[in-house]
Amino acid sequence: MKPTNYHLFDFLDFDTELSRNESLWKAYKPTAVYEKEGDIYVTVPFQKQKLANDMMADTDVPQEEYTLIIRQYNIGITRLFLGFGDYVLTDESEMLQFSDRIQKVPLFIKEQKGKWILSTEDGTKRAVINVEEPLLDRWSELLPDPQETLDITLYPDGKREIRLSAYDHFSPPRYDALPVAFCKRDGRKERATLSFECKPDECFAGTGERFFKMDLSGHTFFLKNQDGQGVNNRRTYKNIPFYLSSRMYGTFYHTCAHSKLSLAGHSTRSVQFLSDQALLDVFVIGGDTMEDILRGYRDLTGYPSMPPLWSFGVWMSRMTYFSADEVDEICDRMRAEHYPCDVIHLDTGWFRTDWLCEWKFNEERFPDPKGFIGRLKKNGYRVSLWQLPYVAENAEQIDEARANDYIAPLTKQQATDGSNFSALDYAGTIDFTYPKATEWYKGLLKQLLNMGVTCIKTDFGENIHMDALYKGMKPELLNNLYALLYQKAAYEITKEVTGDGIVWARSAWAGCQRYPLHWGGDSCSSWDGMAGSLKGGLHFGLSGFAFWSHDVPGFHTLPNFMNSVVADDVYMRWTQFGVFTSHIRYHGTNKREPWHYPTIAPLVKKWWKLRYSLIPYIVEQSKLAIESGYPLLQALILHHPEDKLCWHIDDEYYFGNDFLVAPVMNSENRRDIYLPEGKWVNFFTGERLEGACWLKDVYVPLEEMPVYVRANAVIPIYPEDVDCTDEMDLSKSMALRIDNDYKGFWNR
């Protein structure tokens, strides 16, 4: 076993053999603090350590000094910037997109005994730098005195108190966390760490699409995008270097480097961050509500745009449809039997060779793609196409891509570790750090969009060829950022050609929320797959993303990955979950059309019609989301952060601000339901209840799902049955009033 349970090895990643070419440098107390152009500059000396479980200062080596910059923004955000090398503080970053609400405000220094107090002009305290000697009652010389430390407490919004972990150690030489430190290897500064104190009862959430329970405390996560290969493990497609705390603050680590984040995992006293880059650029966001904090994060990294109306309808797909005739038959049957549907997605089977992505239709199976797409459009269907950001060895474009460096040249051959079912040899990754490669890629999509395609599925993007020469960035930094560059390119050309900004994306990093929308990857068609998907969606919504979807009723099957039968109850329960998600798409390794499940097909149609009735509400809540910090799928803690129970509930959620949804995820048709504080009305029966309370062991027939709505809410609904959103005129929407006369949706 490799773990040692010691900070130096397990968190800071030092080799247990302590090779001589690595060193650790610990921050000491500042020697100078001064103001420059409204920022505070702090001179911090760093002392080399003798590496061992008991760390001691290596006083034979001179200290090195670096400058910590503290910057304050007007909406309760404090920024810490510390570069170990030639790094400069800048707002120029693909990850950053400051809103008009972000304004730098000057900080002023007031020196007191043993402290520098940093305040804004109105006198609000924003940080305290403590250099006072710790109080001692000396009676023993058995152990050495603690080394100097960097002791800073932040007050980002003037209320919340967030302190660096100045003294997280057992005996002075044995550390469990360091406030700030950096590492060298072969003389090069390579890693940096920063730690904040955490409280015994503190809870955490966010960090991306995390397939974990709601409270993430006690866990350590590797922020490195990779093919998740399911939704029930530690891997994830969408890491976001941001977390929320129950102490009403959030932290955004502005980096795309591979990183490690320990939320009271290695030490229960500290939140620790380790970056593979010798740079720390950290935004600490305070707020009175969780929504305030999430909005502050979006103020830094960008707000989501509004998806088109048709995207809120039903999407139908499978892996895969193989011909225009097959698609026509399915679409015609949908209309004939009045299953409302807006999008048909073509996955891996529209190319001349299945999975061989050449961005061109198979001429035999799709002989007239423009006519085919136009025919579907007249019938109310949009077309979405699968593709990916790699060029295969035998692809038509390979010579052009290589000759022009549109794919990054490989330095050695590599094996894939992703879910490449085709066994194709991907010769290279499209280099989105190279503007000419980005324009070339946009050109490939443009010819498809000009045919009438309305959405590009930007699949993959988590993994890139790591032994390759990219024009603008080292692969170690590009790996996480790649999702943002990839999706931005597809989004921009789609909006340019069609007028609608949209992608269907699997990977993500900070800033990707600007380019909706994302889905949850390759879940299993099982109860645990459904539960894992919901957990991931909840944390994703707490990471700045407004829109999210998932494959209904799961992507793959078990025990046979491609061919096992999906159970009727899984299909039905997942349908109900999908109806109350921002976007609903059916997809998977075998047939997903409802008539293949004849026992429940009438119920599915009923729930699809409910979905279309709710589209005015979904549009209303989406407009709110793109101007605030709200997602559509909302964890209970977003509204009830003070309710400790809500920090342990990951199988219920708010849908928008008015619905409370409790999906059933078992074959027994039973579950416990928690109603948080407030007055609630059963959406389907009109029954009135008051929270906070538990409803224990509730029996829920397959045709029903526990859905509650706030008493006295007004829900806009569409009053007519339609086959697609093209038939909708939202001015005809009606107000469904959840008042004392409300008897339930089916009984209105």
Question: What function would you assign to each model-found segment?
Answer:
Residues G83-G85, D145, Y155-D157, R174-Y175, ...:
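Aromatic- and carboxylate-enriched substrate-binding clefts and catalytic-loop regions
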Residues Q63, R235-T236, L244, F273-S275, ...:
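Active-site-proximal structural scaffolding
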Residues Y491-E496, D500-G501, A508-W519, G529-G532, ...:
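Catalytic core of carbohydrate-active enzymes
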Residues I70, T124-K125, F242, M334, ...:
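Conserved structural-core and active-site-/substrate-pathway-adjacent residues in large, well-folded domains
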Residues Q112-G114, D122, T236-N239, L244-M248, ...:
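Short, well-ordered loop/turn elements at secondary-structure boundaries
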Residues M56-A57, T67-L68, G228-V231, K238-I240, ...:
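Generic recognition of flexible, low-complexity loop/linker segments
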Residues T78, L107, N669-R671:
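Short beta-strand/loop motifs in extracellular/secreted proteins, especially
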Residues K2-D13, L18-W25, V44-L51, T59-Q72, ...:
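Catalytic and substrate-binding clefts that recognize carbohydrates or anionic sugar/phosphate headgroups
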